[in-house]
């Protein structure tokens, strides 16, 4: 029985899925906006939201937890130096998923994933 198993498999092994979501989370936190397929975007939201919540409380333990989940020092620095303070007033809902049409090759539904409080474009 698969009761209470709420994540999407995305047609990948568990290690491949974890690595893919880690890479996508790192890309989103670095660039603050990415385009991917809709099911991946919805699953990515479940990975990134807790990371930003970790970044709101700058402690050594939280930095180590964030590094364990991202494996990227630059992302951890940005998470605790820029993104955490930016989202202190917001209690969740840091990621926006917008439908973005369909991919040309296989007509897969695409989504634009972005952080909600982006700085103004220069």
UniProtKB/Swiss-Prot annotation:
Cellular component, GO, one term: cytosolic large ribosomal subunit
GO BP annotation list: translation
Keyword Amino-acid biosynthesis: no
SUPFAM superfamilies referenced in this protein's UniProt entry, alphabetically: Prokaryotic ribosomal protein L17 (SSF64263)
Family that this chain belongs to: Belongs to the bacterial ribosomal protein bL17 family.
NCBIfam families: L17
PANTHER family in the record: LARGE RIBOSOMAL SUBUNIT PROTEIN BL17M, RIBOSOMAL PROTEIN L17
Protein name: Large ribosomal subunit protein bL17
Native source organism of the sequence: Neisseria meningitidis serogroup C / serotype 2a (strain ATCC 700532 / DSM 15464 / FAM18)
